[in-house]
Amino acid sequence: MDLILYLEAHQPRRLRGIPPLKLGEADDLLDVELDRSLFEKVAERCYRPLLKLVEASENGLKLALKVSGTLLEQMEAWGSDLLESLKSLVSAGRVELVAGPYYHSIASLIAPEELVEQTRMHVDLIDELMGVRPKVFSNPFLIYDDRVGQLVSEELGMSVVIAEGSPRVLGWRAPSYVYKSPASETRLLLRDYRLSDEVSFGLGRGYVRADSYATRVSRIEGQVVVVGLPAETFGEFIPAEAGAFEFLKWLPRELSKYPWVRFSTPSEAASKYEPVDELAVSQPVSWLEGKDLSALTGSPLQVAALEILRELRVKALSSGLARAWRLLSQADLLYSMRASMGVFLKFERAACSLRSSIAARSLTSKA
């Protein structure tokens, strides 16, 4: 059986409290000093020790890693050593890079063509920086439905998707098998939410040990187990002193006691096993609360933000302000609005600035 450790690495670009009335460039919306400060903190606590641990591991540790386009930008600007470490691990086959919307955005909730375009942008940037073109797709928070699977296959030519193993969709079936989308040839690798949540919520409290966790994994029947987490779980959400990296350090050794279990990348696992069944996902799933989109679309503020994004998208793209709009489409912003009026107000001010800039450029083009 194959064990895939899938990590999403992302640092959102934070919006300024009061953006300029009109944008000279898209990044005028951003609090760059805050972005750099937070990036450097997380890089020191999480990204550097994580990559060093993978490099030093002698028991076959591999990662499936999605690094958002905006985080890759920050690494280029403020942490080039991280790019070098990552490139080395990719070249050695220790890390498989996964592609998705460049801005870690909710593009799939807005327009199919936006999801396709942002993913192509992400693939191109990874190719430029790492010399590889990812063949595996995942959405932020593992958002997925049949429509996404069809787009990934037909428009992007990618054959593997990592998605949430929602009990609502699986029914009596287990997430520990390769499935196939009914709308395409896309192979689905499904996150095991129980094993994933055990690390997220149990590791920092001392409830999870590498030896007992390895034993649990070894007893699962199936083809593949996907444990999916934010990369920042290790070192940022769960500090090093609470055992975050010790768990990862010792897990490969403990798993080596069970020769039928091995670390794999998504491409390796998907090519090794034939799908056991088709899995129809008519309504979106995610790894968020409720295993659906309610954590992104359930509040009036979130509904209002989505309406604003839909209203401005075509106008922004045709006015040369695509990046500004795409920065506002970051999934983190929408997720945070469910409990924060302050986040929505920053978003609304930025949207007003974008709207004014669109109008100004329209007048200039007509003059």
Model-derived segments and their meaning:
Residues D2-L7, R13-A111, K135-S138, S159-E164, ...:
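Short, well-structured secondary-structure segments
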Residues S153-G171:
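His/Asp/Glu-enriched short active-site or ligand-binding loop at hydrolase and phosphoryl-transfer sites
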